[in-house]
Every structure is written in C-alpha cells, then in structure tokens.
C-alpha cells in the first residue's frame, strides 16, 4: 500500500517522510541503467560539449504522499547523468495542500524539497495562500534552501526593504562546467486567482513573458551563462512569445501535460500536477557564453517511469513501488521507523 507512512501524527509526517526520502536519495545508484534508463547524451571534451540534465515538477501542492515517488525519479534522473542533474519546480510547490502538509503550514513539503535537493523554483500563486508576507518571511526564508524566482514582480518589491525581499529575477548554477541561468515568472492573471490584497502586495509590474525575455537577454548578452531555462507559472500557451535567448521553458498552473514551441524555437513542457509527472531533458551545450549552442533532448528514464502523451514528460506516480526501486524504499523504511520512534 503506497506511502502509508505519511498518514498519521506529526512525527510521522514531518520527520518520517523526510527520512524516507533522504534515504532514497543517498542509496547508491545500483539500479540505474540496468532496467531501462536511456544512455547519457554524452560529453565531448574535444569540442567543449557538456550535458546538463534538468528535471522539473510543477504544482506539487504539498502532496507529500507522492514524495518518495519524486525522490526516486530525481535519483534516477541524476543517475542518468551523475552529478549533473538540476531539480527544479515551476511553482505551487506549496499551498492548496492536503491536510498532512497543510496542518503544518507546508513545512513537511519544504523539508521534503530540501531532501530532494530542490534549490530553484518559480513563485506560483499558491505560494501566497497565507499572504505575501508569510511567503517571503517563512516559505522563502533562505534556511529552506530554495531560490524563488519572479522576474515580473517589481524591482522595488524585491529590494531589501520590499515585501518580496527573498525573491529574485534569476539564479545561476554551474554544473558539469556549464553555467545555467534560470529565470522565473508568475502568471499575469494573478488578480483572477488571488485576493486583491495579495495582488497588490505581489506588485507584478511587467508582463511575465516580457520579464523573462528581458532577464534572459541580460544573462545571455553578459556572457555570464551558457544556457537559459525559463520557469513560467502559467499555462504552456502563455510561453508562446518567449524569444530566442531562452533554451527551454517549463510551465505550470493549469495542471496539464502539454508541449509547445516558443517564438524563439525553444521547447515548452508542462508536467501535470500533484507529483504525478516529471519533465526530464538534457541540455547538450557546446561552447561558452554568447557563442554557446544548446540542443535539448528529451530523456526517457525507464526504471518504472511511464510514458505520457508528451515526449519528455514522464509518469512517476507509484514509482517507489516499482520492483526496480523496492530495495531502495525498503532500506528507507527501517530508518524511517527509527526516526519516527525517536520523536
């Protein structure tokens, strides 16, 4: 019976769940590559080509009962390209959550995300469910380890004295010798899904796509990055006008599985909701800075993941129960019990 250990009292939620997921992440990758994981896209040192893997979830909404599925999927994605995988979220990681996470103000989900190694997320509208101040001061507190991105919030609001002082336009990760810039933005329709007070406090002063294009252009032209990933908390259709400075786009908000192409030719992926799906792509990067070229390749992880109607968006629901992962999860169960009893 899936994820039974997340039903129960606080100690079994906040601590037991995280212990189980941490174990799933640190168990050696013995299973990977033996039950269907696709070959690594490859590096070519002579040409300066390196591959960085992106694994995206969206609209998780505190569904910690699927946390082990996602932990396993992130681990298999990393084993596809060891040490060179970046997990990301396209927003609504928290908020609109089931009781087990909501009762603790989504701290179990934030602890879980830390166990996954998730350090980058777009801001979604549900991050503001308890108010903009609560988001900034608690959820976006640096101690939770996530860089929250919202380029279309006003610069004044993201200043040290602003209501979103812990939010930024973009962040950069250097992985496998390549610098990947991430820029995030929130739906232009915030006013239709949030209270007037939240809408005022968020202070979105630029169209989401315009903000993404502006920041991506700055990153590319500065030579500070070799590739740009956009995280847009809006339906995939909203990304159509993103320009050529963005190499891949992840979207969300509508809880759909979708694919598209931007005006600049970049692929767009939307990976469902509630931890059931994950979009996994390789960025195959040759060269550096303004001269870099980027090719995006969909990754079929195998290992119990399932296909969806969109190539590159995988089904991961129930993954922790797949035979290939049984040893990982049973190893985590004993440690989970020990941690729960200690609380």
Place the predicted regions along the sequence by residue.
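Short linear interaction motif-like sites in intrinsically disordered regions of transcription factors
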Residues: 5-7, 117, 149, 329
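Secretory targeting and sorting signals
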Residues: 4-37
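A short C-terminal boundary segment appended to hydrolase-like catalytic domains
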Residues: 285-343
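Short, functionally important structural connectors and interaction interfaces within domains
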Residues: 12, 17-18, 270, 306, ...
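Acidic, metal/ion-coordinating pockets
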Residues: 36-307
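Intrinsic structural disorder/low-complexity segments
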Residues: 23-28, 129, 256, 310
